[in-house]
Amino acid sequence: MEKLDNDIELLRNLKIEIHSLRKCFDNISDEMVLDNLKKTIIISEKIYKEVAVDSLKLNKVKNYIRFYLPTVNKVLERYIKFKDSKINNKEMVALYTKIEEFLPKAYESFKKIHDSLFTSEIIDIDSEIKIMLKEMGL
């Protein structure tokens, strides 16, 4: 029962983080940031769909749910706050650039996490095909 409660909590947190990403979307004007945010939302929704139906996959993305996605949200919230403050000194411009360079890397990392959810299935199917072909003498 405890595992089920933990799984439900993880899924709830994932859904909350995705919702927070969507809220950030409405407050960003930079097209490059918006594009990366949109891709991050889409891949996060795909991860959610996969782990919602397979608790074994959910275990593979705990760090993503507990740390990576919340960190991206915090970075975006601060980016929005600083952009709204209209501070454009040298340090802030460097920070904006760093954040803008970070977002595509975060997306690529999330994409790898999503892809890794299918690794064992790919190996299983490949093994089944090899065994069947061997048994058929092919």
Where are these regions (language model features)?
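Membrane-proximal, non-transmembrane interface segments of integral membrane proteins
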Residues: 1-52
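Soluble C-terminal extramembrane regulatory/interaction domains of multi-pass membrane proteins
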Residues: 35-138
